Design a protein with these regions (language model features):
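Conserved metal-phosphate-binding beta-hairpin within the catalytic cores
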Residues: 64-103
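Cysteine/selenocysteine-centered motifs that mediate thiol-based redox chemistry or coordinate metal-sulfur cofactors
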Residues: 123-143
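ATP-dependent carboxylate/phosphate-activation module, predominantly the ATP-grasp catalytic core
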Residues: 1-65, 95-122, 126
């Protein structure tokens, strides 16, 4: 298998991402404000450079484990994580489909641009399908 990083995002969740700026939790409760985690959007992120090797290692291990378990994954996936204040990743979900983290940059991200300027997730998938069709291997990339 192989790994290409096409993008990184940060999920915005209703009020939990900003509540700490509003004051003491006790006062907020008095006002009837309670933290919520409703997803309201996603923001593109350029990861701190020192974290990139860890991110790639997690991705590579995911690809390797998928090969061991069921012959590998086809297409994009996203490791949904939190980062501790010790700069350690904690994975809480794997999304094996096109999600915000894999498709946030419509015309390519700084990471996808390293593969080819303007490369989006959709364009990358289309390229793989065209290549497989031309070489008679379409059955290998479709599920």
């Amino acid at each position: 298998g192989s790994l290409e990083m096409l993008g990184i995002d940060r999920r915005d969740e209703a009020n939990i991402d900003e509540m700490y700026k509003l004051g003491a939790q006790e006062r907020l409760r008095e006002l009837g404000l309670y933290p919520t985690f409703v997803v309201t959007g996603n923001m593109p992120v350029v990861l701190r450079e020192s974290l990139l090797p860890k991110a790639f290692d997690m991705g590579e291990r995911t690809v390797e484990k998928s090969i061991d378990l069921f012959g590998g994954m086809i297409g994009p996936f996203c490791l949904e994580t939190i980062v501790t204040d010790q700069l350690e990743f904690k994975v809480f979900e794997i999304s094996t489909r096109i999600v915000a983290g894999t498709n946030l940059f419509i015309s390519g991200s700084p990471y996808a641009d390293m593969l080819e300027p303007g490369m989006s997730t959709g364009r990358r998938i289309a390229r793989e399908i065209r290549s497989a069709q031309k070489s008679g291997r379409l059955h290998e990339v479709l599920s």
